[in-house]
Amino acid sequence: IDRKIYTYKFRKACENADKIIAISECTKRDIIRYFNIPDDKIEVVYQGCDVSFTHPVTEEKKEEVRKKYQLPDHYILNVGSIEERKNILAAVQALPMLPQHIHIVIVGRRTGYTEKVEQFIKDNGLGERVHIISNVPFNDLPAFYQLAEIFVYPSRFEGFGIPIIEALYSGTPVVAATGSCLEEAGGPDSIYVNPDDITGLAGAF
């Protein structure tokens, strides 16, 4: 019922609006497809990220964050709520194909899906190589990005993908999923893989 009410309200808002701002071309296409809104009524305005990600983090701050969270020397980073559509399990499934010294650090809010990820970690003996960290203060996040070797975002669906922008501003290479808007966020210099292609994801790393 909630979904039907939300859909009705969204449709009415789109119909009554003089102009609609979409956060990506992908979102614009969805609005046109699902709500039959004219193309010329919608403008795309991409999102940015907080300015703190555009500045180098001091070595002192990096060392403080590394010690505080016991971060490994070489890790692939993911930032975002740990939920099914964000598909972080795919990156964890790729980890056994990578050298032993490579770890994955997942920063985000836990959901029921986290248990599925943790079960795979347990079943495959990856407990020493996967680090799930929640409740990280915002001012520590830039150091997480700048200490990482790679940022991974294998999400199946996003409206835009701000963490990709944060990673790019941090100078961290991005591997993301095809199929939604992430190629818009990451641009031509990131690597994109089918979110179901675990071997391809490992190869991209």
Residue ranges and their predicted role:
Residues I1-F205:
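Carbohydrate transferase catalytic cores enriched for Leloir-type hexosyltransferases
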